């Protein structure tokens, strides 16, 4: 579809559904301009309608459905005003609606180990049109209800990360991550029937303390040589909420303190946290730790209740969320991606010999 055809199509959709005080493009009240990155809604002022967040969201709802599946509008938290290069004061501003071409598409991987071994650099493919640059990642949070596909997605990430990072796995459930660690010669900290819960969490604290020592050593090296290169080091904790429940206050506070310090100081020294939990409220991890993580994933049932901790300001209206296992939302906060939350389809993969 040519740009002019797309502009006319969007104008027709807005004329029929927007209903703003009887104003339309037929009365020359607004126009639409399409560019590669999205489209502009250009109001001609003065006008009898108010240009605010409510109008922006209404246009978003209309056009996101009209453009699907050719384009996916990127959800904004508020009205996105941009100036236009013109001397005409009546049309010097516009509302901008950025988009991405197509819709979220799931990766299908026939041999995940072979796939991971052939990846270049530190890029982690998530979907066909979405990758994570691990060099720019501070930490990853994966939340979701039981049976939503958290462990399946975690196993994929572990397989990819094993080629670009040193790993330590903490597995309170002694389940899938422990078996993966055993099969891939990765250190696993897991409960033992002869140890108490507090003793197990103390062992986790000891590992986090070692991470903090490593951070300090690398900081000293960076102080003397700002171009020093380090291997990535990742601490993976499954069901993190299980660690903070049922332990003494002193051990719990030490666990929280170490998590915060590692998350705050780890990025420049390439030390990362990968945390998995059914939810990330303040009982799971401290708020300051949660706010440091820049890859946020919510899988499974998506509603305002399940997204309130990872995406507290997100308005779900208009977002086309895929259905099925391993689906949800993802937000990557770095210099390479828009900060907005986008739909997610986690990879489907197969293991050779299974």
Residue ranges and their predicted role:
Residues 1-43, 289-297, 327-354:
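Conserved P-loop NTPase motor module
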Residues 6, 51-59, 63, 149, ...:
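Short amphipathic alpha-helical segments
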Residues 10-22, 59-71, 157, 161, ...:
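Hydrophobic, Leu/Ile/Phe/Ala-enriched alpha-helical segments that form helix-helix packing faces
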Residues 40-45, 96-220, 241-297, 301, ...:
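P-loop NTPase catalytic phosphate-binding loop
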Residues 47-107:
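Interdomain "pre-motor" coupling segment immediately N-terminal to P-loop NTPase/helicase cores
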Residues 58-61, 277-353:
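Conserved ATP-driven motor cores of ASCE-family P-loop NTPases powering translocation/secretion/packaging/pilus
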Residues 141, 232-238:
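Structural motif
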Residues 219-234:
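Short helix/loop segment immediately N-terminal to the Walker
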């Amino acid at each position: 579809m040519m740009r002019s055809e797309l502009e006319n199509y969007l104008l027709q959709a807005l004329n029929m559904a927007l209903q703003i005080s009887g104003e339309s493009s037929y009365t020359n009240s607004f126009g639409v301009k399409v560019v590669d990155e999205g489209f502009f809604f250009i109001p001609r002022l003065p006008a009898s309608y108010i240009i605010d967040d409510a109008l922006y969201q209404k246009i978003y709802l209309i056009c996101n459905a009209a453009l699907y599946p050719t384009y996916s509008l990127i959800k904004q938290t508020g009205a996105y005003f941009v100036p236009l290069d013109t001397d005409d004061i009546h049309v010097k501003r516009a509302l901008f609606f950025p988009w991405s071409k197509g819709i979220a598409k799931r990766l299908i991987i026939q041999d995940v180990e072979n796939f991971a071994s052939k990846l270049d650099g530190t890029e982690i493919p998530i979907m066909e049109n979405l990758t994570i640059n691990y060099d720019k990642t501070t930490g990853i949070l994966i939340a979701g209800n039981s049976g939503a596909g958290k462990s399946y997605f975690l196993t994929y990430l572990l397989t990819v990360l094993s080629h670009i990072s040193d790993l330590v796995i903490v597995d309170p459930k002694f389940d899938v991550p422990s078996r993966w660690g055993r099969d891939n010669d990765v250190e696993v900290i897991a409960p033992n029937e002869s140890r108490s819960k507090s003793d197990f969490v103390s062992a986790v604290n000891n590992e986090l303390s070692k991470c903090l020592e490593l951070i300090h050593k690398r900081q000293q090296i960076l102080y003397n040589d700002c171009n020093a290169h380090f291997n990535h080091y990742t601490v993976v904790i499954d069901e993190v909420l299980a660690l903070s429940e049922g332990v003494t206050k002193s051990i719990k506070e030490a666990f929280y303190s170490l998590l915060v310090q590692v998350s705050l100081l780890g990025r420049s020294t390439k030390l990362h946290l990968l945390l998995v939990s059914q939810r990330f409220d303040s009982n799971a991890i401290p708020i300051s730790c949660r706010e440091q993580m820049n890859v946020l994933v919510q899988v499974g049932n998506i509603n305002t209740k399940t997204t309130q901790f990872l995406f507290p300001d997100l308005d779900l209206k208009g977002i086309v969320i895929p259905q099925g296992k391993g689906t949800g939302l993802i937000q990557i906060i770095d210099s390479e991606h828009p900060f907005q939350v986008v739909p997610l389809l986690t990879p489907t993969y197969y293991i050779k010999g299974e």
